[in-house]
Amino acid sequence: IGFREFVKKSVRWLLRWRHPFWWLPDVPSEQDESYRRIWSHLRQIDRVADGRHDTEDFLNRRGDLVIICARVPAETFIPEFHTLLKVLDTHDYVRLVPPDTHNITVQELGYLSERPNGRDEITPQWLDEYLEQCLISLKDFRPFDVRVGGVNSYADAAFLDIHDNGWFSRLHEVLVDFVSQPPRTRYPFLPELIIAQYIHNAPMGTLVHDLTPYRDMEFGLFRVEQIDVVRIPTDEA
């Protein structure tokens, strides 16, 4: 086959595809689209839901909940972020997340238990082995920058969008590979910084109106140089 004929056939092959492979969305684009859909959904509802983490099931657990996360330094945020928190706190169904616990969860591992009785429980021995595997797999990851904001909200919690060029999703893919029984989830992984939980079902009121000025605002930039294993006690709210 001659070169010209090869080119013609290649062009015809490409034109048959409505969306060539290089048009496929990348991870950052997919994340941005997910954030837009979440915000759009918020504008279509008129009530918030109970999104507390400290449910009766949580408080009845005997062992700590273990997560892998990136902590967000307090100095990351510009003054407007603290103004946003004050605005959120005017709603009686809002419980702000303590600033010293701000983090981006990459993988939830489960509750510690000497005798696991479900897919969401793990033994201390399993945790040690899991972390050893992760150390090997993550050794080639390099530090990366993260921009936080603007504000967004599920029906049960307010959060900040995360712009990380897709790195948290890549970390999640590595970490979830070693989970013996990956958690059942309804939605794909999406990085987020939860800043408030809604503590009961209630009319939304002016929430969307109050958050709109902060929707496209960037609240800060920080560099992820490590991820942490955090144990959350289940004997306290």
Regions found by a protein language model. Give the residues of each.
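Histidine-dependent nucleotide/RNA phosphoesterase domain, centered on the 2H-phosphoesterase fold
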Residues: 2-237
